[in-house]
Each structure stands twice: as structure tokens, then as C-alpha cells.
Amino acid sequence: MALWTRLLPLLALLALWAPAPAQAFVNQHLCGSHLVEALYLVCGERGFFYTPKARREAENPQAGAVELGGGLGGLQALALEGPPQKRGIVEQCCTSICSLYQLENYCN
């Protein structure tokens, strides 16, 4: 009984110092399997769109190929455009940091 009364104030302090579940997750770098697990956590039963890279390549082996059609004119147009702007979940949550609210945008 005496041990319990000594531990109670310590447990109360730990409970006050512990971050709320949403605050513990607010802004993080999430890459690979950690990103997928976070999406499972956030989306729950709604689910999210996910196709593993190996499966994507098996279904469409030409998906990564760049088609330049148009000869030299096509190359010049690509050179003027610069690198493509990537705005996917990997750029948003792995390269940069993202919040739970940003992850929810990728739920079904």
C-alpha cells in the first residue's frame, strides 16, 4: 500500500508530461513501410490507394519509360520545361514532413 501511494504522484506527472496521441504524430518524416503503416492507422476502414512498386512494374513494365515522340522538337520542349514537379505523398511525407491531416488526403 505504501508503494502505491509513492508511485501515484510519479504516475500523475508522467501522464501530464506525455504528449497527446495526435501531438506525438503531428509532423514527421514517413518513408517506406512507416508511411504505409501510418496510412493504415490514419485511414482505418476507409483504406487508401496502394500498389507496391514491384507489383506496379509487373503489371506495366513500360510505366517508367519516357516517350519523347516528335524528334528533336520534343527534346527541346522537355529541356525548356525543366525537371517534373513531384507532388505525391512521398515528396510530401518522406522528403519533407507531413501531418496527420495531410495523410488523410490520401485516404479513400
UniProtKB/Swiss-Prot annotation:
Gene name?
INS
Subunit (UniProt)? Heterodimer of a B chain and an A chain linked by two disulfide bonds.
**SUPFAM superfamilies hit by this protein:** Insulin-like (SSF56994)
Q: Which Pfam families match?
A: Insulin
Disulfide bridge partners, by residue number: 31-94, 43-107, 93-98
- Keywords on record: Carbohydrate metabolism, Cleavage on pair of basic residues, Disulfide bond, Glucose metabolism, Hormone, Secreted, Signal
Tell me the compartments it is located in.
Secreted
Q: Which GO terms describe its molecular function?
A: hormone activity; identical protein binding; insulin receptor binding; insulin-like growth factor receptor binding; protease binding
What is this protein identified as? Answer: Insulin
Keyword Ribonucleoprotein applies: no
Q: Which domain of life is it from?
A: Eukaryota
